[in-house]
């Protein structure tokens, strides 16, 4: 199929390098209904309940019904169960050996998992960590640092990461209660051991690789509830999304997708793309996924308050329930849209070479892709190579090739997404320029 030149194509002449959020497309009333069902009072109540366990440190009490990590994980499990019979709820349990540092002795670690089966086995994750930690206090208003051998001091962890766990629990509730039969399988995970070095997530990813699970996307939420930063700046109008490079990696495609769906279903609440794996020098439970080749992103609040983090002051008073609710809705919009969409198309040949050429004229962008089961059509995206997000798009029919007249593949990046019969689009598959291998030149 050859696409006729239209006004959208002519916009390439005016590219100035600034990122533009794509204009919202048609809103699916089904997804809009699910997003709207996120409940702010319930969000606030979940944060408070998690903080009320006193501490959720990995080595804290496992026998009490009201205090420590044992009580917290059982409560989380019960919340998943209460969300409805469609969810398959379990503990993802590991016996972790003592290895010094943050793991001073043997410990049983339990991630809490709920699975909402879809029509296909491909998985989409939303995650947060439910464990907490706090520096020890000196009794005089100061702190003495971390003591990883002890777990008896308060660590309410309302924002870090009670907020992310709240995203997971509320997303599970509204998506399970929606009655929608999603194409993809949705997985909700509250990880443990994040504060000990991403332990629960690392073990879970290893299991996923061993089991051969296909995981298309991971949305990790860590510190997403505060709108008042430690530097005195407040910002309740945006959330940051961190994604692993390089520029057109699968992780970056997830970030762009979340931003696009947020503009559609949560207008006025910006998703800010941050082109790095995490905050400087930091990491999160998305990190092990990316390290194992599974595309993942991290969502975090716009303005952090470092004084509250890992302290007895990380209480519900530092969480803005209205702001956190909007961040839950951003997650739900992306999860529902992606789970209703087909798989992303394959844009390389059997040798891994991108199916993108200059066409017969030598000056057009000619692209091809493999057909996707369940796709009703495809959407082609392109942008100037220096710009972080898609600037132009055109929807094509049920075809497997297209030509963009006058579009130079030297100057733009091109991608294609599959569109389902209800209009939901997949992640975008990008035509990435192959790496040139260093050639060894022999001399005499």
Per-segment meaning from a language model:
Residues 404-425:
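Beta-strand-rich modules
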Residues 42-117, 270-272:
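A non-catalytic alpha/beta surface segment that caps or lines the substrate-entry region
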Residues 191-288, 292-296:
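Metal-dependent peptidase/peptidase-like ectodomains
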Residues 421-444:
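Extracellular fibronectin type III
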Residues 49-51, 224-240, 274-343:
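Active-site-adjacent mobile loop/cap segments within catalytic or ligand-binding domains
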Residues 21-67, 307-312:
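N-terminal capping segment at the start of a domain
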Residues 363-374:
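Conserved aromatic anchor
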Residues 114, 126, 131-132, 137-197, ...:
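Alpha-helical metal-binding/catalytic segments enriched in His/Glu/Asp
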